[in-house]
Amino acid sequence: MVPLRSFVLLNGLFFVLLAARTVVTRVIDKDNLDGILETQDGQNLSKEPFNLEETYTADFLAYTFNGTWTSDTTIVYTDTMTGDILQFDVIKQRLTVIVDSSVMDDYIVTHYALSPKGRFLLIGYDFQKGFRHSKFMRYVIYDIELGGYDKIANGMHIALAKWAPLTDDLIYILDNDIYYMRFSNNGFNDVQRVTYDGIVGIVYNGVPDWVYEEEVFHGSSAIWFSPDGSHLAYASFDDRNVQEILYLHYGEPGNLVDQYPTEVKIKYPKAGTSNPVVSLTLVDLHDPTLNKIDLKAPIEVVGTDNVLSNVQWKDFDHVIAMWSNRVQNKTEIVWYNKYGEIVKTLDVVEHEGWVEIKNLFFYKDFVYMRKLQPSGTKAGRFHHVTRYDYTLRSSPIQMDLTPGITEVQDIRAIDHSHGRIYYLATGPGEPSQRNLYSVPVDGSEKPTCISCNVLTPEGNACTYADAIFSPFGQHYVLICQGPDPMIVGIFDNTHKKVYSWENNLSLRSKLARRELPLVKDLYVRANGYESKVRLFLPHNFDESKSYPMLVNVYAGPNTAKIIDVASYGYHAYMTTNRSVIYAYIDGRGSSNKGSKMLFEIYRKLGTVEVEDQISVTRKLQEMFPWIDSKRTGVWGWSYGGFCSAMILAKDLTSVFKCGIAVAPVSSWIYYDSIYTERYMGLPTPEDNLGGYNGTDVSRRVEDIRGKKFMLIHGSGDDNVHYQQSLALAKALEKADIMFEQITYTDEAHALFGVLPHLYHTMDRFWSDCFSLSHAH
C-alpha cells in the first residue's frame, strides 16, 4: 500500500503532469517575477477563495523537471510546444534538436527513449493500463541515422522495453517472456528469446506480478543490466499457487458489448496465504547460448518462503540481491559473482519492527547504506548514512556518518572526484523538512546542508528538496518543493547554480489572486508522545469565532502527512471557501521521529495511530475555544479510510461527529501479504491472529452508531478490494446502524474517472455535518 500522496499530486489531483514548459518559459523573467512578488506584498489584487473544482483539476499544479541526464553535462527532454526531442548542454547552455517531432506524427506517443549511443529512438504508443505502474504498449524503433522504422514483436502489445547501457541493444517482454534484440550497423536487428516458461497472469519473467509491483519494486521492471550491458539479472515470479481475487467489470451503460459483466481475475496473495515463488537468474547476453545461472537465495537465513526486496549491480562483475524472510524483519544482502557464486553477505536484523533497506552505494573498499543507528536520545534510533567495510572479514566494521536526531530518507549519489556522499534528510528535530546534505565518505567532517542555502523567489529558505544527479555527480538538478511554489535549478558540484530551469511564474501569478490558508504548526503531547500537528486556518481567521474542524488522516506506518511541500488542494478549498479548519496529525507509527515512536505500531495496526488521532483532536478542542467540538469530522483514503472508520468505532467520547472512509481496508485479512505481514506478522494462532481480529473494523461497528458515516469505494479497485467495504457495510447493516454508501462502478483505487462526483458528494456531507450552507 502506497500513501495516496505518492500518486495524488497536490492533495486531490490523481494524475501527474509530466510536461514542462518550453525553453523560453524556463528562463527566469526577473521583471515578471518581481512584479508578481510586489503584487503579493502590496495586496493590490482582489483575492478570491479556492473553489471546489480546483481540487481535482490542474489549475494549481506546479511544473517540475521533465528531463533525463544523458551525460554529466547534457539533459534530454521534450519541448511540449513543438514536440521536438531536445538536448540541453548545461555548460554551454545550448539546445540541439535531436529528433524532430514529425518522426512521431503517425503515433499517439506515450513513451519514448533514446538508445545510449543516440542512434535509435524507441517509441511507445497505443497505451493499455496494467496495474498501478505497469502498462502495455506497442513499440516501434526509429533509426535516426537511416530514417527507417522497425516494429517490435510485430506490433503486439508488450509489457516492457528497455535499452541496455552503453549499447544499442534492447530487452523487451512479451507475454511474460524476455527477448533480446541486437542491432547491426546497417540497422538490421536480431532477436533471441531468453525465457520460454512465461504464462500470462501466472508466471512472470522480467516484470513483477501484482504484489511485487505494488509493494516491493514500486514499478513495472524486474530486470537489471550490468553497467556495460553484457549481463542481465532478472527476477521470475511463479504465481501458480497464489489465489485469485475476482471482481466484475460492468462496462459502459447501454452498450450491447457489455450486456454481461466481464470477470477480472488477478493473482493476489492475501495475508497468510501462498506468496509467489520468486527466483533470480543471471544471463550472459554475449553468450550465443544465453546460458542461465541461478542466483540462489540464502534460504538458511531467510527461509524458502522469502521475499526478493532489491537487486542492483556493484560493478561489471558483481550483482547484489537483498533477500528477506516472509515477515521482513530479517534481510540478507548477498554479493554474487558472474558465475553465481556467493562471495560476500551482510545480515540486517530488526528485533523491534521491520527492515527497510534501499539501494547501496560504493566507494573504494566501502559500501554505504541507509540504516537505523542509535541517536543517544529517548527517541531511539534514526536512519543514518552508514559506512561498511565490505572486504572479506567475519565482522564488517560500520561507521555512522550522520549522527543525531536526523532521519536520512534516501542516498542520492557519491561524487567520486571529491569524495562526498549526497543524501536527503530531515533537519535535526524537523520531521516535516527534507533537504539535500553532503558528508565526506570518510566521515572526517560534519554533514553540510546544500539546499538550506537556496532561497525561493519569496525570500524563504528551501525546506523540502529533491535532487537528481548526473551519471558521475558533476551536476545535479535541485528541486525545491517548499515552503513556496516549486523552483528547479541546475547546479555544478561546487554548488554553483548554472541554470534556472523552472520558477513557476504562472502559478505564482495565479496564487497572488487567491486567498491562502494560515498555517499553525504545534506539538501536542498525548499517550506519552509528542504528536506533530498542522492546522490550516481560514484566511480571515478570528479567534473570537468558532469553526468546524476536519481532520484528514492517513497514519500508515512510516508515513507522514505533515511535510513542507507547497500544495493547494482540498485543504485550501475547505479553509478559504468553507471556513473549516483543516488538520493533519502525525502520531505514533509516523516517520522521521525515531524508532521508538515508529515501531509503536508494529504488529498492532489500527490501535496506537488511531488512539493518537482521537486523543490529540480532543486536546486541540480543549486547548482552542475557536475549534467547535460539536462540529469535528474526519476523513481518509485507503489506509486513511481504514483509520477514519476505526476512529469512529473507537471514539467513545464523541470527539468526532462524522466521518468519511474512501476505499478503506476494513480487515487486514483481506489485504495483500507482503504489506500486511511486514507490519502485522501472520494471521495464525501461533503468531498474531489476535492482533488481526482486534484491528478488524467490522468487529467494532457498534460504536459507530449515532455518528454520521459515509463509505465510498470503487467496484474495480484491484488494490483495496471492494470486498473490504462490502464486509464493513454488511456488519453495519446486520447491526441496524445507519450509514451512507457510495459505489463507483468500475472505478479503481484512485477514483480518477469520478472526481467531480466524489468531491461534490463529500462537500454535501460536510455541509450537513457542520451545518454549513450548501455550495453552488
UniProtKB/Swiss-Prot annotation:
SUPFAM superfamilies: alpha/beta-Hydrolases (SSF53474), DPP6 N-terminal domain-like (SSF82171)
Keyword Cell membrane: no
Tissue-wise expression: Expressed by the venom gland.
Places the protein is found: Secreted
Glycosites: 44, 66, 329, 504, 577, 693
Any one of the GO CC terms: extracellular region
Reactions this protein catalyses: Release of an N-terminal dipeptide, Xaa-Yaa-|-Zaa-, from a polypeptide, preferentially when Yaa is Pro, provided Zaa is neither Pro nor hydroxyproline
Principal location class: secreted
UniProt keyword annotations, A-Z: Allergen, Aminopeptidase, Disulfide bond, Glycoprotein, Hydrolase, Protease, Secreted, Signal
Disulfide linkage: 449-452, 462-480, 658-769
GO molecular function, one term: aminopeptidase activity
Active site: 638 (charge relay system), 717 (charge relay system), 749 (charge relay system)
Record Pfam families: DPPIV_N, Peptidase_S9
GO annotation, biological process: proteolysis
Signal peptide: 1-19
EC number: 3.4.14.5
InterPro entries recorded: AB_hydrolase_fold, Peptidase_S9_cat, Peptidase_S9B_N, Serine_Prot_S9B/DPPIV
Function: Venom dipeptidyl-peptidase which removes N-terminal dipeptides sequentially from polypeptides having unsubstituted N-termini provided that the penultimate residue is proline. May process venom proteins into their active forms and/or modulate the chemotactic activity of immune cells after the insect sting.
Family under the similarity heading: Belongs to the peptidase S9B family. DPPIV subfamily.
Protein name in UniProt: Venom dipeptidyl peptidase 4
Organism: Vespa velutina
